[in-house]
């Protein structure tokens, strides 16, 4: 059997049982408590018939409970399926059947999204759930045999007797979720051994230590935020998240707990730097700032390196690959943070449309090899064959869809994305999914969604709308209409009413929409 995550958890639970593994606000989970709680919940899952390769849905925000549910599923050989807790009923109606989840763990709500209501709105015959376990007050849980409180679930079915599953190297650890170009879910089969290997390698590169405390801005339910935290846990350190990002408490937490590693996106950094009295916070304990998820402007990197004296490590990664390439101020300071090099445990190619390597100075698609490249898109063999290539050595390469310039010295410069994806803050928004929801609005005849630059969130969502007749549509009206259907961050930031959506051979001509004289 291959090495597994639980080997590390069990080791640290024995060596440092009372050490805090995870802290979210004032809630703490020690290494010993982690082993105890995953045993109880894992045994409860087994008691209701969940076992090897069964899928366990999780629709919850950052919390101790989220972490315990995830690893309880892994402990018994089942596969956790983290879902964005901002997901509405339309998204969940596609996502849950696609995952084949038998049981789902939820909280009452997250932000303005009522998760219990979203699940309850689904037609039972259209989803696969046999049981919904709720971390909520009993009076909020539907009076239905399918629903049960988490407290009752563990009391009735749980015990302290739960063996740890022994996975093969390629056994699927979890299904990571992301939307496809039409909003149809893409489900990523994350390999257990490969994911462990890449997280260990990255933790070694960053020189993480057992006495480190890491504060993450990204969420647990995003593969990046989860994986970066695991890099620290594998060293026996402490990881910290917030239920929701708050710049003041983020800075106060760094100061209070002497945080040594902070994980940020460019958007979060802009918010932090604009916090009143930012200079009064003591950040002297921070030795590394770890960046992912968005383009990192040189101006922001320079503030952290030169003004704050903090090492900047910027990575391009994806849910399909884990870490891919890196820019590290300890080595690359003075160059653009969008100029990346491969790591010792990764490999890259830059190819043209015929899958041939391009020459230096040319632009092509980035191909990446790591041990952590997904084994497949679950339930989608066509997409798997298109995006995952296997070489003569049996190594899996991922076609990222990222466009890069191939520069001398093995450097690749990020140039953009080949897909119609809007990077709004730390979230990926597929324009086609927003268009599809807009077209269900009774006042809208046609719609086209694109992006435009935004000084804080990077890109904002722009919806060009052709109303029916003399109807008027406002952003506020769309926000109310989207509520409960799609995640709140998918609501268009800007609405432009037009007389007609210009098309050519059925395709929207965005270049005309963007011209001011057309609006």
Q: Language-model segments: which ranges?
A:
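Conserved AMP-binding A3 loop
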Residues: 30-32, 173-197
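Conserved ANL (AMP-binding/adenylate-forming) active-site segment centered on the GW(Y/F)…HTG consensus within
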Residues: 309, 373-401, 418, 435, ...
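Conserved AMP-binding/adenylation subdomain of ANL enzymes
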Residues: 196-213, 221-261, 275
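Gly/Ser/Thr-rich phosphate-binding loop
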Residues: 151, 234, 259-264, 273-335, ...
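AMP-binding/adenylate-forming catalytic core of the ANL superfamily
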Residues: 87-97, 104-106, 262, 370, ...
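Conserved AMP-binding/adenylate-forming core of the ANL superfamily
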Residues: 2, 18-63, 67-71, 88-93, ...
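Conserved ATP/PPi-binding loop(s) of AMP-dependent carboxylate-activating enzymes
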Residues: 342-345, 356-389, 427-429
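Conserved pre-ATP/AMP-binding loop-to-beta segment of ANL
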Residues: 17-18, 133-134, 152-177, 184, ...
